[in-house]
Curated annotation (Swiss-Prot):
It comes from Shigella boydii serotype 4 (strain Sb227). The lineage of its organism: Bacteria, Pseudomonadati, Pseudomonadota, Gammaproteobacteria, Enterobacterales. It is found in: Cytoplasm. NCBIfam families: citD, PRK13253.1. Belongs to the CitD family. Keywords: Cytoplasm, Phosphoprotein. One of its GO terms (cellular component) is cytoplasm. Its main location: cytoplasm. The modification O-(phosphoribosyl dephospho-coenzyme A)serine is found at S14. This is Citrate lyase acyl carrier protein.
Amino acid sequence: MKINQPAVAGTLESGDVMIRIAPLDTQDIDLQINSSVEKQFGDAIRTTILDVLARYNVRGVQLNVDDKGTLDCILRARLEALLARASGIPTLPWEDCQ
């Protein structure tokens, strides 16, 4: 999936996450995580994000994640909504990502 434009998903409310994405000129993934629970769950947050990006074959992006103690399922949902917005695809290719 190609990321064509910057996008934002989520809020800064307690129990939620705000994720910002922007395309890069390289194929790197620049991941910046700011979390109130990073010491306890930082590795799990990073693993979840990289798993979703790999599932949709996303490369060449900068991600800024402001986590306020969100659950894993919400993190995945916010990230999938973000990818749809940033790629310009109205619906994600669910069949290809199972």
